[in-house]
Design a protein with these regions (language model features):
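Terminal, compositionally biased low-complexity regions
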Residues: 1-130, 195-198, 204, 280-308
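Alpha-helical solenoid scaffolds in large eukaryotic transport, assembly, and signaling factors
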Residues: 137-145, 176
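Solvent-exposed, amphipathic alpha-helical segments
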Residues: 149-157, 212-216
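Short, contiguous, well-structured surface segments enriched in hydrophobic/aromatic residues
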Residues: 153-194
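Long, charged low-complexity segments
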Residues: 201-282, 287-292, 296-299
Length: 308
């Protein structure tokens, strides 16, 4: 039986950031399971002796988890695998080393970190994984994901004339998309709108919609602090066939067609989704951040003893 070169690969996190990885190789025969077990039992001895290489980019722990969720992480170790003449599909064991110590939360196979491996819980059952449910031809269908997570409910509320609740959920949807795009930073709501949504057709700007969002989400009124101070014009949504309406008088609230705004945000989501087609690093940020969200369409159903 031929010997195969197999690899213990280590990602070194120091002070919360990974900049380097290490590789220690072995030559073994036997089944893949036996080879993997050999690598696992040598983790403690191998990681201090591994040859170190620079990662092509730095990773936080959350970013590295997202990279494993997305797919083939071996691309980040190409320099070492080329140097050691690895086979196209090498047997490997990948372990994080956190401040000098192996950190193993769970053991998984070589495939992408998805589905029940990520979402299963003994207490809460299994949560659907959007990277499984919404991937078609190796591409994530972002418009369908956002439709199911937000716009089904937004349309349901609108069609049932629950316009205030509909507006609140629309603002929450923009909040989520802005966080996913720009992270938790000031101005992300307005930045997302300015980048992807045409608001001028509605006679408003992103700052005005941000202040409207603050008032309607937090207090269910139309008067944020900046609106009350006179620094920003107030907005009042309406539902009707007229796409726009003039303000009743100078300084009075600007009318905003709610249906028109929903349509404009939906168009913006299409443009936003297109921006992920070619940018892998941006997609990693999406997975890192969207993993933190919750949704009506991704709920766990689990049996409770004594109940049906």
């Amino acid at each position: 039986m031929a010997f195969e070169r197999i690899f213990n690969i280590f990602v070194y996190f120091d002070d919360g950031l990974a900049r380097h990885y290490g590789v220690r190789h072995h030559r073994r025969t036997g089944s893949d399971d036996a080879k993997c077990e050999h690598l696992r039992v040598h983790v403690d001895g191998d990681h201090p002796l591994a040859q170190r290489f620079s990662l092509p980019r730095s990773f936080t722990a959350e970013q590295w988890l997202a990279a494993q969720r997305v797919g083939d992480v071996l691309q980040y170790f190409e320099d070492a695998l080329t140097l050691y003449r690895a086979s196209p599909s090498p047997v490997f064991c990948l372990t994080s080393i956190v401040d000098g110590m192996p950190k193993i939360d769970r053991t998984i196979g070589p495939k992408s970190f998805r589905g029940n491996q990520v979402m299963a819980s003994e207490i809460f059952g299994s949560f659907p994984d959007y990277l499984v449910e919404y991937v078609e031809a190796d591409r994530l269908d972002l418009p369908r994901l956002i439709n199911d997570d937000y716009f089904i409910a937004i349309r349901t509320l609108f069609n049932n004339r629950l316009y205030v609740s509909c507006t609140k959920l629309l603002m929450s949807c923009i909040d989520t998309l802005a966080f996913v795009e720009f992270g938790d930073q000031p101005g992300n709501f307005a930045n997302w709108l300015d980048t992807y949504v045409t608001l001028t057709v509605h006679g408003i700007n992103s700052e005005e919609l941000w202040e409207f969002r603050n008032s309607v989400l937090h207090m269910t009124n139309l008067a944020s602090r900046k609106v009350l101070s006179g620094n920003v014009s107030p907005i009042v949504p309406y539902v009707g066939t007229q796409p726009t309406l003039p303000a009743a008088s100078p300084g009075s609230p600007k009318p905003l067609n709610l249906y028109g705004l929903i349509a404009s945000v939906a168009d913006g989501i299409g443009k936003w989704a297109e921006s992920y087609n070619e940018d892998r690093d941006k997609f990693l940020a999406f997975v890192e951040r969207y993993d933190l969200t919750t949704s009506d369409s991704r709920m766990a159903w689990c049996p409770v003893q004594g109940h049906t």
